[in-house]
């Protein structure tokens, strides 16, 4: 059964739906029952001949539809916020990827230039790094 707060909170919608469903209801009829679910059911029952159960089911469906619409709107808002956050994250990732790719390309070019201009030093450094890596692997396996 519909309670007083639900009815008052959605009075305009309830009133409109009642007049749509039962065309013989007038504005004056509905104003007699404003705020009281029991009076509203009584007025609608008296004017239309509908059963109390039928009227209560109709009122529940009107108010439940309103609740469902509100829930749907809330879900839609959260969905839009999540999409915006995902788009921002993707843009940030793209931007940083491009920055890192250009930096790594610059480092690669600098390294190639250094190897061309100083081949002996580059070879000695590469040899030293190879010895260090081999020692780490060799002594790491003994433990």
Swiss-Prot record:
Please give the InterPro entries that the UniProt record associates with this protein.
CsbD, UPF0337_stress_rsp, YjbJ_sf
**Annotated Pfam families:** CsbD
Coiled coil (residue ranges) = none
Regarding protein family, the annotation reads:
Belongs to the UPF0337 (CsbD) family.
> Which protein, by its recorded name, is this?
UPF0337 protein RB4474
């Amino acid at each position: 059964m519909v309670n007083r707060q639900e009815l008052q909170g959605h009075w305009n919608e309830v009133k409109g739906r009642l007049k749509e469903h039962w065309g013989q209801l007038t504005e004056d009829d509905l104003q007699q029952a404003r705020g009281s679910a029991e009076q509203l059911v009584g007025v609608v029952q008296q004017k239309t001949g509908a059963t109390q159960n039928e009227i209560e089911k109709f009122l529940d469906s009107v108010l439940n539809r309103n609740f469902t619409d509100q829930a749907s709107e809330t879900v839609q808002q959260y969905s839009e916020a999540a999409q915006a956050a995902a788009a921002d994250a993707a843009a940030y990732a793209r931007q940083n990827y491009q920055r890192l790719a250009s930096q790594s390309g610059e480092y690669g070019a600098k390294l190639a230039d250094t190897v061309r201009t100083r081949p002996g030093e580059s070879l000695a450094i590469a040899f030293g790094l190879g010895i260090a890596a081999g020692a780490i692997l060799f002594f790491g396996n003994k433990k």
